[in-house]
Amino acid sequence: MKIKVSQLSNRVHEVKVTNRILRNTLKYQLSMAESDDVENKSFTEQLHASLNAVNSNTDFIVNTLNLNKAEKEKLDDLSFAETVKIATRVALRVQGLNDEDIDMSAKKADASKSKDEDN
């Protein structure tokens, strides 16, 4: 499968969806779900969870797309929100969704979010 991340380069990354890639995708998603559950944790545990979230996102992108040095540096210069968007898109692509489905889902989520904010 071909995945292009314009925020990092013009290169199209060829990703073969192997068991390793799928396993790493699921590990990434699990770590993100676990990092959301920090409400009843100590401040130190919350910091560790935040650091883990940053590392999990960047490591997932680097390893899945096999980024080169210049792309890794660009990734490190992005905001955390941009990095999460990229990681989420890559994970969904690995799981079989196409770009159009992902974009449509994101638009629906944004519309729902703005509705909730209006109420």
What annotation goes with each model-predicted range?
Residues 1-9:
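Short, intrinsically disordered N-terminal pre-domain segments
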Residues 13-16, 20-119:
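Short, surface-exposed, charged amphipathic helix/loop patches that serve as local interaction elements
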